[in-house]
């Protein structure tokens, strides 16, 4: 396992990134509600729904893509999809584009998870798989804790002019 520590560290970093992106959705919801003036809160519920439906849709096709093209191209596409989704929303910041963007980002996250699960088994070794899987979940947990804090910092400290106290329970707590 010593010769694969670098690759295993890279895989753990990927899990961190996946969790960071996935878990920043929660703190964003109140700001999205106020930013888009959503009066029907069910509309806000569509945001994570679109994100996670993409997981369900893309998991099996991602496995087929891995079998056909290999891990590297699917891993690259898995990182490219969130980039594309983010750029699309930045260029057209509308509610429908937000939903489409969340869906595209979710597709990428599903591709990444589908690549990383078997890859961490191969890199960490069959005999160490339980440890490696738990280490991946630990990294996932750390990122899920840190991502709202980073969002809080960005909103409160970097742009105090537009920050409105009391609008977001995640930021104000």
Model-identified regions with their sequence ranges:
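Glycine-rich segments within core transmembrane alpha-helices of 12-TM secondary carriers
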Residues: 130-155
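C-terminal ends and interior cores of transmembrane alpha-helices
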Residues: 80-93
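Intracellular juxtamembrane helix-capping segments at the cytosolic ends
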Residues: 111-125
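Extracytoplasmic
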Residues: 6-38, 117, 147, 151
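Helix-breaking motifs and short loop linkers at transmembrane-helix boundaries and internal kinks
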Residues: 70, 91-96
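Central cavity-lining transmembrane alpha-helices of secondary-active solute carriers
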Residues: 46-64
């Amino acid at each position: 396992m010593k010769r694969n520590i670098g690759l295993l560290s890279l895989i753990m970093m990927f899990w961190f990134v996946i969790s960071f992106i996935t878990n920043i959705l929660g703190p964003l919801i109140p700001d999205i509600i106020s930013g888009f003036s959503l009066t029907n809160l069910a509309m806000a519920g569509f945001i994570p729904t679109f994100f996670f439906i993409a997981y369900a849709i893309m998991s099996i096709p991602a496995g087929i893509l891995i079998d056909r093209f290999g891990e590297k191209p699917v891993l690259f596409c898995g990182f490219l999809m969130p980039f594309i989704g983010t750029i699309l929303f930045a260029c057209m910041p509308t509610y429908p584009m937000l939903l489409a963007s969340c869906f595209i980002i979710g597709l990428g996250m599903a591709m990444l998870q589908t690549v990383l699960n078997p890859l961490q088994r191969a890199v960490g070794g069959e005999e160490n798989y339980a440890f490696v899987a738990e280490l991946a979940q630990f990294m996932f947990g750390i990122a899920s804790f840190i991502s709202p804090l980073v969002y809080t910092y960005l909103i409160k400290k970097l742009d105090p002019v537009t920050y409105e106290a009391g609008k977001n329970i995640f930021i104000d707590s």
